[in-house]
Amino acid sequence: MTLRECIKQLPDSAGVYQYFDKDGHLLYIGKAKSLAKRVKSYFNFAPKFKPNSNLSSRISKMISQTHTLQYIVVNSEHDALILENSLIKQLMPKYNILLRDDKTYPYIYIDNSQKYPRFEMTRKIIKSSNIKYYGPFSVGARDILDSIYELCALVQKKGSLTSKKLCLYHQINRCLGPCELHVSDEDYQRELDLAKELILNKKILIKKLQEKMFYYADNLRFEEATALRDRCERISRSEIKSEIDFASSENYDIFVIASSQSRAVVVRIFMREGKIISSSHDYIQLHEGYDEDELYQRAIMGFYSHGKPPIIAPILVASEFEGKDSIEEFLSTLFEKKADIKVPKTAKRKQLIDLALLNAAELLKNETKENQSGILDEIKKLFSLQRVPSRVETFDNSHMSGVATVGAMSVYENGAFDKKSYRIYHLEARDEYAQMREMLLRRVESFLKNPPPDLWILDGGSTLLNLALSILESSGVNIDVIAIAKEKVDAKAHRAKGKAKDIIYSREDIFKLLDSDKRLHFVQKLRDEAHRCAINFHKKTKLKSDNESKLLTLKGISQAKIIKLLKHFTTFDAIKEASVEELSTVLNLKDANIIKSSYI
């Protein structure tokens, strides 16, 4: 069936549609209240079947590449919105705008049902009328919480009240001591009120921290003074600079977008009880034009898709966007109350939008990430990538004669290594091909929870490159892949520097770049970081394995028998968990009992 025939048979139902090019690569995922009307709007049918002349250059180019169409019918536009958002995060279509800020932000909360309430941090929201939440905080939540307990005489630890005995915190005036002393509700409430003021007003918080810092310095407690100085700097850096204070209890979530020629930034600002308490931002690499409507949809859906927030605030945006009604319907269902997305009309609320736009422009202007030197653009051009790789995942494995086999994934995003996103893998496979396959399959399985990157880099040659491409194709995921390996000398690949050059493999070509080429240096830097991570994890795993092996050797189990066990069970943890019956299928019953008793 031709594309034209397929379009003419589309139902007048809500659903999600997917465009593919002639090679079967996914180009775009969209949603529709009516699949027939929406998809037909992309085309002119007479006198010639072609892209609609009213489309933007970006969408027109996409439609000209479209060869086949697939669609999924759902019950409502609301369901289509949710499915579209999920599929885009998993499958990374070429022409969809990809927003990676998919994480949940922490809140600081207090449970007022406790006799002496404490402040704690959480990402999981508990429904209770007694719990009050402050946030969300994109950064700095831990620093704020630590500062509260530094400056306010509250119960410092959860278990303190059960001891019925004064602890060190009371002696250093950081707790009123309700575990043993009589503390009135009024006295404790005073400390709670101060803590709440510090959470909502960063200026007062930083001022009080600086006062304590100077006190420590005057008393030659330089280590403590330095720690507070660093904390003040982190809290200060994390906040939008603003004099805005509504002197009211108003809450708002503000979303704005600004763009340059090749980059856009999404800025979120959170106002709670009339004060700006936190902000966050994300850079987006633009390609093939720019669709602000889609970016607003992705930004708002991505932020709220984790569940109902504890504080439901009106959402302010800088401009109207297509799909706003669908987003409001989705959020109303999620919030269990009417969601409100609006462009502010009053001067007071416009201040918030102006502030967010000012910060967005400043972020674009002052961006000092590595892409400013053009290296990522050059990488895209050299290797014919689909998009500029703002997020790159690099894979390597490490073992010693098949023992302590591990893999590592390093992550490079927006010009820096994102070590919080690194992953390490215990691998069961014996050869390097199977090890890489195991690692990549496990990463693909986690795409729903942690969306795919723009680029994979593998430490290996064309064989591993083709393996990765095959895995991605079978999963329907649209990611670029390159591989880097040492040139073979005397039929051997020498990793040691100076012995052989690095060769880079892409889907379409092989690259032997000069040693001085900065594009080679960039790929090597990412490969070396993954290798470092894999080696370090291997050393730790090997040390643990050696200690376990020594334990069994002391119990009379020979090294040959230990190797036999590892070949069967793969890891010492699996050996520990095995029953005597399972162990006796590999060794004799006497040895099985010795091993089992060794781990009791």
UniProtKB/Swiss-Prot annotation:
Pfam families: GIY-YIG (PF01541), UVR (PF02151), UvrC_RNaseH (PF22920), UvrC_RNaseH_dom (PF08459). Residues 12-97 form the GIY-YIG domain. GO terms for molecular function: DNA binding; excinuclease ABC activity. Residues 203-238 form the UVR domain. The keyword DNA repair applies. One of its GO terms (biological process) is nucleotide-excision repair. GO terms for cellular component: cytoplasm; excinuclease repair complex. InterPro entries: GIY-YIG_endonuc (IPR000305), GIY-YIG_endonuc_sf (IPR035901), GIY-YIG_UvrC_Cho (IPR047296), RuvA_2-like (IPR010994), UVR_dom (IPR001943), UVR_dom_sf (IPR036876), UvrABC_protein_C (IPR050066), UvrC (IPR004791). PROSITE patterns: GIY_YIG, UVR, UVRC. Keywords: Cytoplasm, DNA damage, DNA excision, DNA repair, Excision nuclease, SOS response. The keyword DNA damage applies. It is found in: Cytoplasm. Belongs to the UvrC family. Interacts with UvrB in an incision complex. The UvrABC repair system catalyzes the recognition and processing of DNA lesions. UvrC both incises the 5' and 3' sides of the lesion. The N-terminal half is responsible for the 3' incision and the C-terminal half is responsible for the 5' incision. This is UvrABC system protein C. It comes from Sulfurimonas denitrificans (strain ATCC 33889 / DSM 1251) (Thiomicrospira denitrificans (strain ATCC 33889 / DSM 1251)).
